[in-house]
């Protein structure tokens, strides 16, 4: 008991020297709570360039349809986590929406997660195919979109490339302009993504578990020494440390409950190097450009002349709040200024705006309020 008690204290207060917490893949599956939604309706379909992608429908009513689009190295399950009392899927379902969860080609639930296809292909092919699928199946003339992070970035690319059939959108944490924290600015400035690609690294993952080999375990130890993490955000989760190293701190720890933090390995996984390279280009350019760095998007600002609400965590360290402020001001200067709104969420970071323990009270009402105006 003494050794266990001392070990527990050390795990809590030992900082980088505490034992890392790793998921045991051989443990029995955890019991998940039943979600307060209907049975899912799954639709697989092919994009024009041959990618197999997926939409999962939950028909909570006749409002919408609304398509929920996740970020990078995750899946649409970020909207349906069972570890919080009410997730965004359940929230919109209870409010009468016809909800469609999109898993585009980089979703960690699809075999194409490590595809090296240009990110522009998501905008050019995945979004049009998904919007057309929803309109065809539902019979709706147009849809609404709630897009998070990389999903929001590629949504802006898609709209600026001429996407049709979207009547309003909520953009979480990202837009068409980018400001990054110093550590990410250094990484992009050193072209670390390009360097890794040249030495044969074709993907990076936040996932790790107890079966990790010696190299993975060494990496797990190394990432705990990340000097950019504030002491108040220190923890013993190797997955959490990997997430922070790859992307920046994506949440305020006090906005996640223990169950969500303990199951981050279920939500985060692999991403291909072409995605990291494109994010590096965006960070360096400060605006939407193609994978080759071509300025092909912002010249069509009129294509974003739909109602868009921007939501940004005040503590976001992936894309700083100034990012969506730049996009918000740019749109208001060039289109009808009344089409756009922006809400900065105090005490929230990045993805905690999606699955934070109190997101249903602190964040979701802003999403719902915007959707209701064009439901």
Regions found by a protein language model. Name each.
Residues 1-14, 136-141, 150-290:
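Alpha/beta-hydrolase-fold enzymes
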Residues 27-59:
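N-terminal cap/lid segment of alpha/beta-hydrolase-fold proteins
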Residues 47, 54-109:
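Short, surface-exposed "cap/lid" segments of acyl-processing enzymes
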Residues 70-72, 143-152, 313:
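Conserved alpha/beta-hydrolase "nucleophile elbow" surrounding the catalytic nucleophile
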Residues 117-137:
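Alpha/beta-hydrolase active-site loop
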Residues 304, 310-312, 316:
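Short beta-strand/loop motif that positions the catalytic acidic residue
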Residues 317-323:
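Conserved alpha/beta-hydrolase "acid-adjacent" motif
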Residues 334-375:
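Catalytic active-site module of serine/aspartate enzymes centered on a nucleophile-bearing elbow/loop
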């Amino acid at each position: 008991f003494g050794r266990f008690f001392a070990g527990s204290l050390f795990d809590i207060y030992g900082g980088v020297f505490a034992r890392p917490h790793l998921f045991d893949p051989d443990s029995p599956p955890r019991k998940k709570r039943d979600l307060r939604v209907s049975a899912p309706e799954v639709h697989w379909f092919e994009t024009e360039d041959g990618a197999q992608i997926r939409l999962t429908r939950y028909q909570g009513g006749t409002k919408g349809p609304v398509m929920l689009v996740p970020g990078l190295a995750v899946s649409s399950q970020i909207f349906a986590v069972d570890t919080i009392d009410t997730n965004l899927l359940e929230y919109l379902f209870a409010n009468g929406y016809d909800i469609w969860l999109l898993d585009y080609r980089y979703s960690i639930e699809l075999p194409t997660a490590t595809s090296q296809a240009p990110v522009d292909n998501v905008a050019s092919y995945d979004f049009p195919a998904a919007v057309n699928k929803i309109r065809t199946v539902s019979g709706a003339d147009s849809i609404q979109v709630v897009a998070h992070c990389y999903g929001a970035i590629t949504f802006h690319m898609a709209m600026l490339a001429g996407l049709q059939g979207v009547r309003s959108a909520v953009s979480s944490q990202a837009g068409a302009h980018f400001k990054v924290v110093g550590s990410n600015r250094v990484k992009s400035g050193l072209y670390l993504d390009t360097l890794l690609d040249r030495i044969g690294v074709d993907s990076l993952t936040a996932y790790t578990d107890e079966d990790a080999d010696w190299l993975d375990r060494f990496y797990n130890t190394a990432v705990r020494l990340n000097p950019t993490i504030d002491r108040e955000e220190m923890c013993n989760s190797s997955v959490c440390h990997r997430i922070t190293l790859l992307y920046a701190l994506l949440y305020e720890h006090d906005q996640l409950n223990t169950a969500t933090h303990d199951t981050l390995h279920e939500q985060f996984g692999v991403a291909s190097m072409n995605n990291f390279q494109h994010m590096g280009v965006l960070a360096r350019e400060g605006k939407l450009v193609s994978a080759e760095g071509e300025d092909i998007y912002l010249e069509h600002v009129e294509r974003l002349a739909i109602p868009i609400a921007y939501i940004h965590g005040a503590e976001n360290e992936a894309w700083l709040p100034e990012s969506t402020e730049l996009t918000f001001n740019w749109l208001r200067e060039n289109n009808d200024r009344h089409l756009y709104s922006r809400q900065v969420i105090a005490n929230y970071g990045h993805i905690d705006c999606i699955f934070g323990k109190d997101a249903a009270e602190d964040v979701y009402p802003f999403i719902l309020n915007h959707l209701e105006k064009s439901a």
